[in-house]
């Protein structure tokens, strides 16, 4: 009665749960049995199901059910860690009458429990758990030999191991024992290409999952291994097996990156089976739900021998010389396979051939399109560098550094994209590829900092020490990270630190650039110049200015700042996420695969191009559209210009009143030539008077009209050409013509000041500064001069005077001449002539004291005739010339002359 009661209970449970399991699709090949957890085909829609399979295991123990009963399977069932060895006989065909009563005649093929297809006979085969292997068909009929298959570990098989521990085998009894192993599983039906996590997995899988998620690298989700862990390790067709459910996640990868089998490789192996392979033609769903225990060897197609260590879970399988292929060699426990260097922080999860087949034209557009954009950045930076020496805009050193950084970033990005995009052809060594991958990041970050300086400072920006140190630190850190990660595996965190630092700098400087563009635009619209004091009107601008000092130039340059700042924030965010993903945070299940990887890499490249291209335009604008282009920029660049030490200001004048300096310093400075000399064409007189009424020159022309350019308040350098080369005579005269050598009464005095108010001497820069000339003209201001003056004499024939000039040279161009103001009333005040030295004996009446009284001009009521006046003037001229010659003779041998 006990046997019949157990049998009835079993049949009742089978009928009860037949509807719960539902109909299952038939296998693709006739005679191939199906399993319980066959996923829904790809064409059918996924639906939520609740599988309450009571995985029945019939343990038939009796006189006919012995341990050594032959079975018809060529590959034994894989046992769980705690499964009894006697449980494997449940799948074999028995000769016990009770077995025939339960399962029917031996000609019927075994189908899965609860299936309603294939006939009206009851299906009494048990539901095996997911950890067991497939069963072969009956041995009665002529069937093809069973071909063992390689199994693939998936999430369905790894997280649903429901083997329960059991004790030692019991003594054989002649009774029917029903054992219920309930595996409650709820969730969506598995579909091809997607992994499903059970809502209520088994106890062992739950503990492993909880331990993995509570770890530091799996809190936000399970991350994946680097790119080439699966695409470059094994030949096609090779799979990887794990030891347990908790062994699905390994320690491979970068900084705790877990190891999981790629679902795309499984899909590739299962979606296109060969028509000539009967084992590959089996249902791919049955293969997906099959688990392979590492303790059971995987035999080749020609090896039908049972394993030697069937009941030893810890024993290693033994393979003959030809029984195990390369891809079927067992893994050594506790020693994971060696993973290559992780070139990417977000994995591709497929090999390059499959990924490029999926991408199609998108791969070509990604590689060549982005490579062309980086090449354009490099060309713009090179053009700006070539134009900078010719245009020489303000702030040229800072612009040159910006162009150099952009040229480096553009070339290091464009070259690997065209030559070996993302290393898929393995043309570049790993170290070179890592350097080309990491070095553009500090260059772009430093470029953003230079853009902030160019747009923020009104004066010519000087590259500060902090920015230069930061640039060197970033480049050194990137190079050290690439070298360390390529040489030694434990130094890989240095590469993460470098990438994180550059991501933070890019985001920070991009935000600062956006803020500067907005704040500077508001300040410009308010009307105050950027960096100025707020006053209006004509103000003296400094000699060196910012390349964007004009309002219109700054406004045009500021248009590139929002674009560069926005793309810089995008690039920094993507790089930061890449670092977090490598650390184990943010790795969601939908981010692995070719298309997410393609989109992520495209976003990174577009963010870098969006930063580099506006910065290249920013550096090119001053070189093309600089409002002020100084001449001879090459000479100034290489210090070849004669005026590079002190450039001349417009008109030869300084902006403010000059300080009182020694007269000899005018030659040393070279920029105080306020009144240059001019050479007269042809022979000229010894004495040149312009606008004066001096007697003694007969046949003088009428008084010429005063030139407006010769007035004391006008520019004195309009009618003059550049000065002639300095000779020794002129240098000595200028060095000795100081106020300390001449008496205070010379050219001054009561008679001169009373008789000639408003008249003054205009001296060249070699004899004094413009300030002294104005002081003398101010001291001599007074009432107007008498209207009646004698007419001056005529100019000698052959002489020529520059229009409006009041100085000249003698016939031999070796002496300097001073004349009075031409716009004053026509009088001849005092004239001094410096002529070549003559013998000192020609002036016997020269006083011995060396001090002379000021010469008074002739008055209107003077009774002296014209001949006497002419003789007196000639005598005075001779006395003055003799005094000058004596000074020259005494000072020629002096050591104090500064040439």
From Swiss-Prot:
Transmembrane segments: 370-390, 392-412, 430-450, 467-487, 500-520
Cellular component terms per the entry's GO annotation: membrane
Signal sequence coordinates: 1-23
Domain of life: Eukaryota
Segments for region (Disordered): 110-152, 295-340, 769-797, 839-869
InterPro entries, sorted: PRRT_domain-containing
Low complexity composition bias: residue spans: 840-851
Annotated keywords: Membrane, Phosphoprotein, Signal, Transmembrane, Transmembrane helix
Membrane topology: Multi-pass membrane protein
Modified residues (Phosphoserine): 641
Keyword Mitochondrion: no
Protein name: Proline-rich transmembrane protein 4
Source organism of the structure: Homo sapiens (Human)
